[in-house]
């Protein structure tokens, strides 16, 4: 199996906390936009933003894969994009991996008030091939797509 790599950061290895979650049954397209929105944010701000999107108080901006996404009035002008959605399933898994990374940072003794998301990315996972029985002895192939999420928190 290949090793886990990430961009070279100019932060001491002891000031980083990492977390990975693999084979998440969520769309890579939604996860891409969620990761792009919270990259570089402080941990508490990112969690608050994602919880607001879950409660539909604020829409998540969609930069890529936004075909058919409506313009939302509750998107902040700082995003410089008007179309957005509420990808709840993807956000639940991102919150889960952020919580794991926060626990890792806490066990390393990092100050959680000054922790920032230095790296977050979503990658394609494995594709599970399934078959659905049809009439007259036939079957139709069905795919289940998965994704991987990786997070690195750093103390600023």
UniProtKB/Swiss-Prot annotation:
The keyword Ribonucleoprotein applies. GO terms for cellular component: cytosolic large ribosomal subunit. Belongs to the universal ribosomal protein uL22 family. One of its GO terms (molecular function) is rRNA binding. It comes from Sulfurisphaera tokodaii (strain DSM 16993 / JCM 10545 / NBRC 100140 / 7) (Sulfolobus tokodaii). The keyword Hydrolase does not apply. It comes from the Archaea. This is Large ribosomal subunit protein uL22. Keywords: Ribonucleoprotein, Ribosomal protein, RNA-binding, rRNA-binding. This protein binds specifically to 23S rRNA. It makes multiple contacts with different domains of the 23S rRNA in the assembled 50S subunit and ribosome. One of its GO terms (biological process) is cytoplasmic translation. NCBIfam families: PRK04223.1, uL22_arch_euk. PROSITE patterns: RIBOSOMAL_L22. Part of the 50S ribosomal subunit.
């Amino acid at each position: 199996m290949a090793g886990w790599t990430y961009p070279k950061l100019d932060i001491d290895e002891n000031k980083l906390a990492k977390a990975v979650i693999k084979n998440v049954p969520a769309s890579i397209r939604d996860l891409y936009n969620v990761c792009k929105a919270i990259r570089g944010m402080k941990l508490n701000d990112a969690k608050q933003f994602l919880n607001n999107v879950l409660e539909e108080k604020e829409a998540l901006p969609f930069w890529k894969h936004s075909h058919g996404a409506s313009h939302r009035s509750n998107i902040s002008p700082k995003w410089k994009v008007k179309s957005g959605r509420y990808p709840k399933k993807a956000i639940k898994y991102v919150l889960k991996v952020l919580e794991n990374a926060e626990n890792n940072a806490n066990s390393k003794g990092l100050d959680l008030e000054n922790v920032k998301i230095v790296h977050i990315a979503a990658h394609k996972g494995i594709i599970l091939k399934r078959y659905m029985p049809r009439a007259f002895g036939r079957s139709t192939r069905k795919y289940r797509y998965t994704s991987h999420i990786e997070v690195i928190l750093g103390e600023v």
